[in-house]
Amino acid sequence: MNKTKVLYPGSFDPITNGHMDIIERSAKIFEEVNVAVVKNIQKKSTFTLEQRVEMIEKACKHLSNVKIHQFEGLTVDFAKQIGCSTIIRGLRAVSDFESEMQMSLANKKLNDELETLFLVADGKYAFLSSSIVREIASYGADISELVPENIVEDIKQRFNDK
């Protein structure tokens, strides 16, 4: 497994500036950051898998060492498939740590070679989540400081179509 390749999985429904902070910081540390959009059949998404991938591609186009993927199934299996031995996760609060630690331990049980690294969110993004963006956007309020500027219109359009 390659130690310079990392995996950052998530639903990214939609990607936020908090996600981008984690991606950009990871891109400075590691040679290759693999952002993987999870197709979770148990979770109803606001944006299609294709829309989420497209928004992330737009948001990350300035980062030459970031690759975008989509997958269905277990993160540990996908990490192995693309040769990553490290998963990156962002932490906003203690509540994130509890759930992320559980997931990290479960992943380690499934693949002993897989490590999880936690990056603490920048304080200005500690409140930010995709669900907050969706709620604010659903009321037509300004989301321009919450998501990458080049996807604001994509998100607005989705809520105007409803």
Curated annotation (Swiss-Prot):
User: CDD domains per the record?
Assistant: PPAT
- The record's gene field reads coaD
* Cysteine disulfide links: none
Is-annotated flag, keyword GTP-binding? no
Q: What is its main location?
A: cytoplasm
**Alphabetical list of InterPro entries matching this protein:** Cyt_trans-like, PPAT, Rossmann-like_a/b/a_fold
Please provide the Gene Ontology terms (biological process) for this protein.
coenzyme A biosynthetic process
Q: Which reaction does it catalyse?
A: (R)-4'-phosphopantetheine + ATP + H(+) = 3'-dephospho-CoA + diphosphate
Record-annotated residues binding ATP?
Answer: S11, F12, H19, G90, L91, R92, E100, Y125, A126, F127, L128, S129, S130, S131
Q: What is this protein called in UniProt?
A: Phosphopantetheine adenylyltransferase
Question: Gene Ontology cellular component?
Answer: cytoplasm
Picking any one GO molecular function of the record gives: ATP binding
Q: Where is this site: Transition state stabilizer?
A: H19
Q: Which family does it belong to?
A: Belongs to the bacterial CoaD family.
Pathway(s) the chain acts in: Cofactor biosynthesis; coenzyme A biosynthesis; CoA from (R)-pantothenate: step 4/5
Q: ATP-binding: is it a keyword of this entry? A: yes
Q: Name the positions where substrate binds.
A: S11, K43, T75, R89
What quaternary structure, including any partners, is listed in this protein's UniProt entry? Answer: Homohexamer.
SUPFAM superfamilies in the record: Nucleotidylyl transferase
Secretion signal: which residues?
none
Enumerate the UniProt keywords alphabetically.
Answer: ATP-binding, Coenzyme A biosynthesis, Cytoplasm, Magnesium, Nucleotide-binding, Nucleotidyltransferase, Transferase
